[in-house]
């Protein structure tokens, strides 16, 4: 349920936003939430109850400010007796006035924003005090390099995320 360099915010060009969102939501329903020792599980619990409470607090705050939940939680089977098993969630209609989009939520949830162009995306990507990891998804390597050079981040990926190279030092 948690990854130190997992995707937290997604900015999508308005030209492909609707198609992207439909596919992303569809893929989110493929997660199998459960005991990480079970073979079919591909989404486990968050580390502790206080982490689950923090994640839910940030999501609920965003929802109270107008964010829209895209995932129907009733379509997931999960161990209800364990509150640290969080259903994955996709939030839209999010803004940077929401802590969900500017702080590290660190859970199985993501905010997706429509942007007009790469300049707006870069501005929003840099609107974070952390600048830990960024990932650009494109077919054009020159655009990825151009954006990557403008993003204030310690780690930059093209067409991948949360990847560790054994040749590089990584402390999480």
Predicted features along the sequence, with ranges:
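Conserved donor-binding loops in enzymes that form glycosidic bonds
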Residues: 14, 45, 111
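Flexible, acidic loop-helix segments that line cofactor/substrate-binding pockets
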Residues: 2-9, 25-57, 74-85, 102-107, ...
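Conserved C-terminal structural/oligomerization subdomain of aldehyde/semialdehyde dehydrogenase
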Residues: 78, 85-172
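Residues in well-ordered alpha-helical elements
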Residues: 14, 18, 53, 60, ...
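Short beta-strand and adjoining strand-loop segment in the mid-core
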Residues: 9-16, 90
């Amino acid at each position: 349920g948690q990854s130190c360099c997992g995707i937290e915010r997604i900015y999508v060009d308005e030209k492909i936003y609707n198609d992207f969102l439909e596919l992303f939501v569809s893929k989110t329903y493929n997660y199998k939430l459960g005991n990480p020792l079970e073979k079919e599980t591909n989404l486990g619990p968050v580390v502790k109850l206080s982490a689950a409470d923090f994640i839910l607090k940030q999501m609920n705050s965003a929802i109270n400010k107008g964010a829209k939940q895209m995932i129907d939680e009733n379509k997931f089977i999960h161990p209800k007796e364990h509150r640290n098993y969080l259903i994955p969630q996709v939030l839209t209609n999010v803004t940077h006035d929401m802590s969900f989009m500017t702080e590290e939520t660190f859970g199985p949830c993501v905010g997706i924003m429509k942007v007009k162009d790469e300049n707006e995306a870069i501005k929003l990507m840099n609107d974070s005090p952390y600048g830990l990891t960024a990932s650009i998804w494109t077919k054009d390597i020159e655009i990825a390099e151009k954006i990557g050079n403008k993003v204030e981040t310690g780690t930059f990926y093209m067409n991948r995320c949360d990847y560790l190279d054994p040749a590089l030092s990584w402390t999480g």
